[in-house]
């Protein structure tokens, strides 16, 4: 055998070895992928091993990636790349170079997300062996408290009975809309989220910026705390979650001067001119327009201005200089031509004549009311003033007049306006409502029978309008026969418990009683009686007499409408009164609003949900449990409605959605899946309602139970979480259940993310889709797009994303 032949054989052997190594590498990679997915699922809810498991997962992804990189890029065949891409749910109908880049990006995203999870875990001081106390305080008791509180073993023991942590997690509060609508301390939550640079979703429904608008409209006051807040808001979210152009536009539409100043103090932000429609309803908003126009008008293009200020009063706090500045802005050519509903140019001509008049600095800084106090048109010394002073006052009057002509319209002006602009005769003939109060009171008093007592509805409206005990006493002294009849039902229409208690005393003094109709169904809520009033009535049978045939308790149905329901304590008190044996709830038991009510029902429920074929459950009133124990009645499951006695057993009539909501709010997720004949559409509807707050644990169980095996259900769910900008759930699925994205048209999800301008969600889907720059431009409908700003120039085939 010659040397050449020997060399050829050696080369062939080396090539075969390389091919075998490549094949082995692909097989190992495929095996690791399968094993890693099981590791992810197994490690999900194991708190004690979280840190180790996170390290294993990251190591696993890094090992996969390193195995992939060990293969020579030039030697990886298209078939091998397609196999790896297909196993990970990636597009595989591309050339070798694009496939390689896409797979590389895919692993970079996976490793990045896993490191985020690990960092969150490591940042939690309770996951450390010896949490460090960072505060310095001379108060020894406070230091002692924090040392005890931060002790991991003691802390876990104290909160060992808290069973809702996997369901209600502060870190998963991300929707600004839901935070503001569901929590009384919403401002504090938002401040904390912004301070910690937590993920926030600013969009809701079809409005991508409603959350930002809500924040800017609620945090306006010029304080050091608010200034720091707006600086953080801009640094953490502008051009990171919201394009600077859109951020600037929402600041203007919210008339937030503090945020506007913070925006222009941030030298890293660059914007183009934005088009704005102004709807001005307050004097403060006019001042905002004046500041914006004088300092930053090169950044705005005004389309139109609508001014509808009701009862604008510039006399109380306005200085003359402030008034002149506002008039100058309003009658500036660029502004004046954009204001709608202008009748003529007369006021503009008046302004052009008076604008050159010069006032002294002292006069400009003088309060309007103080400046005009020495003289009015009705002052008899007015005619004796010298011409110069007379002319100056006329100029001021004209400024006031043309201001009100433009912003006040035909609305009633403040008393000061009439006082300074009319003579005595005109003033009397044109009194505003405030001046007419005494005369109006006399008219009402002399004609009350004729005006208010035409029918029962008028009586009810009168009772409802009573705001004080004095008003009720006045009716008692003058109209007992009309408003204090025996067995009247006026108590239903009283708007205050204090007034009702006084009403009761007055009725007792006359030896009379209230009454209520003994109907089978009693409405409580928006269309019925106020629940607190009804609770008072049923607890005082000596004063409130039932009209009609007496019924057994089992015949009463209490229909609760939560639209106007006052709260948990009244609800529980109504049920615990044991007056009703049948309760019907007409409204959805939405997440966060009715958690306490849901848990109270759940804690006292004596039904087994697996036997619950009907939309009803039975509860045992906790305040009457002792009666059952003494009488030997079992508190077991599947109880019947009873005989309507005092056993404390109540039937609550629900639909399946309400039942699911109660169980979810009470962290009884397993019981949800025990309900016989559970309609899958109910789960779909429930997911839609709770999507912004849905827990990872619930999603995990849905997947394990095969809920998403149905394509349409998966489609609805994924669409919903993308529409709600639910990045935490998407990341969770991406890391733990990426098979959810297999065989799904991920391009539709990408289009939804682009329409929401949520680049963090979009970048997770770009790697799964072939998407070009041309397609991106065709989808974007707004002038300012964060996705286009960050990714637009990177897109060729949609795969050059976050390559870092």
Curated annotation (Swiss-Prot):
Region (Disordered): 1-24
Residue ranges, compositional bias (Low complexity): 8-23
Superkingdom as given in the UniProt entry: Eukaryota
Listed name of the protein: Putative uncharacterized protein DDB_G0281631
Classification of source organism: Eukaryota, Amoebozoa, Evosea, Eumycetozoa, Dictyostelia
């Amino acid at each position: 055998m010659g040397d050449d032949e020997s060399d050829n054989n050696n080369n062939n052997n080396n090539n075969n070895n390389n091919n075998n190594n490549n094949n082995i590498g692909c097989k190992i990679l495929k095996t690791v992928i399968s094993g890693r997915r099981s590791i992810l699922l197994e490690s999900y809810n194991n708190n004690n091993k979280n840190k180790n498991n996170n390290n294993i997962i990251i190591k696993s992804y890094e090992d996969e990636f390193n195995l992939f990189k060990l293969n020579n890029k030039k030697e990886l065949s298209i078939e091998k790349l397609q196999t790896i891409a297909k196993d990970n749910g990636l597009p595989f109908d591309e050339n070798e170079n694009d496939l390689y880049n896409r797979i590389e990006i895919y692993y970079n995203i996976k490793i990045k997300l896993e490191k985020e999870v690990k960092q969150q875990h490591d940042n939690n001081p309770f996951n450390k062996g010896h949490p460090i106390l960072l505060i310095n305080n001379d108060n020894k008791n406070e230091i002692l408290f924090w040392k005890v509180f931060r002790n991991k073993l003691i802390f876990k023991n104290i909160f060992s009975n808290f069973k809702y942590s996997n369901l209600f997690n502060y870190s998963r509060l991300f929707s600004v809309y839901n935070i503001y609508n569901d929590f009384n301390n919403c401002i504090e939550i938002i401040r904390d989220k912004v301070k910690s640079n937590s993920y926030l979703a600013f969009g809701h429904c079809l409005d991508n910026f409603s959350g930002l608008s809500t924040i800017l409209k609620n945090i306006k006051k010029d304080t050091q705390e608010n200034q720091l807040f707006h600086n953080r808001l801009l640094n953490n979210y502008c051009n990171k979650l919201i394009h600077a152009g859109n951020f600037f536009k929402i600041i203007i539409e919210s008339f937030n001067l503090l945020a506007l100043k913070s925006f222009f103090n941030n030298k890293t932000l660059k914007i183009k001119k934005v088009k704005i429609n102004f709807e001005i309803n307050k004097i403060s908003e006019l001042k905002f327009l004046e500041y914006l126009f004088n300092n930053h008008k090169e950044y705005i293009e005004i389309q139109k201005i609508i001014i509808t200020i009701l009862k604008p009063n510039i006399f109380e706090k306005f200085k003359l200089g402030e008034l002149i500045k506002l008039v100058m802005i309003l009658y500036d050519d660029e502004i004046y031509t954009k204001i709608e509903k202008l009748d003529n140019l007369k006021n503009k001509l008046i302004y052009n004549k008076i604008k050159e008049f010069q006032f002294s600095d002292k006069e400009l800084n003088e309060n309007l009311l103080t400046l005009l106090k020495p003289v009015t048109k009705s002052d008899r010394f007015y005619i004796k003033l010298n011409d110069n002073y007379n002319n100056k006052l006329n100029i001021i009057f004209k400024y006031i007049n043309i201001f009100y002509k433009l912003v006040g319209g035909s609305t009633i002006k403040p008393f000061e306006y009439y006082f300074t602009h009319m003579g005595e005769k005109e003033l009397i003939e044109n009194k505003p409502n405030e001046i007419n109060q005494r005369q109006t009171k006399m008219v009402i008093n002399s004609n009350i029978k004729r005006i208010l007592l035409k029918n029962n509805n008028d009586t009810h409206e009168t009772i409802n309008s009573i705001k004080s005990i004095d008003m009720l006493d006045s009716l008692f002294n003058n109209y007992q026969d009309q408003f204090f009849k025996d067995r009247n039902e006026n108590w239903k229409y009283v708007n205050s418990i204090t007034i009702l208690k006084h009403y009761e005393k007055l009725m007792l003094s006359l030896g009379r009683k209230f009454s209520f109709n003994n109907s089978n169904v009693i409405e409580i809520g928006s269309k019925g009686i106020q629940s607190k009033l009804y609770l008072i009535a049923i607890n005082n049978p000596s004063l409130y007499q039932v009209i009609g045939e007496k019924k057994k308790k089992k015949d009463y149905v209490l229909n609760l409408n939560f639209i106007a329901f006052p709260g948990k304590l009244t609800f529980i008190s109504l049920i615990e009164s044991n007056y009703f044996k049948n309760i019907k709830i007409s409204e959805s038991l939405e997440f966060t609003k009715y958690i306490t009510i849901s848990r109270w029902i759940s804690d006292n429920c004596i039904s087994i949900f697996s036997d619950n074929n009907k939309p009803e459950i039975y509860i045992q009133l906790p305040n009457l449990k002792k009666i059952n124990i003494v009488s030997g009645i079992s508190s077991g499951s599947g109880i019947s409605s009873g005989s309507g006695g005092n056993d404390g057993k109540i039937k609550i009539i629900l639909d399946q959605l309400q039942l699911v909501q109660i169980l979810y709010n009470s962290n009884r997720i397993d019981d949800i899946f025990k309900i016989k004949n559970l309609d899958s559409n109910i789960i779909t509807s429930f997911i839609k309602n709770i999507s912004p707050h849905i827990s990872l644990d619930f999603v995990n169980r849905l997947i394990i139970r095969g809920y998403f095996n149905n394509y349409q259900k998966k489609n609805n769910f994924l669409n919903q979480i993308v529409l709600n900008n639910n990045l935490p759930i998407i990341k969770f699925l991406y890391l733990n259940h990426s098979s959810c994205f297999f065989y799904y048209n991920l391009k539709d999800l990408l289009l939804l993310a682009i329409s929401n301008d949520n680049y963090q969600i979009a970048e997770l889907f770009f790697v799964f889709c072939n998407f070009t720059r041309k397609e991106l431009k065709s989808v974007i409908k707004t002038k300012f797009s964060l996705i286009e700003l960050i990714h637009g120039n990177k897109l060729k085939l949609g795969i050059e994303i976050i390559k870092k």
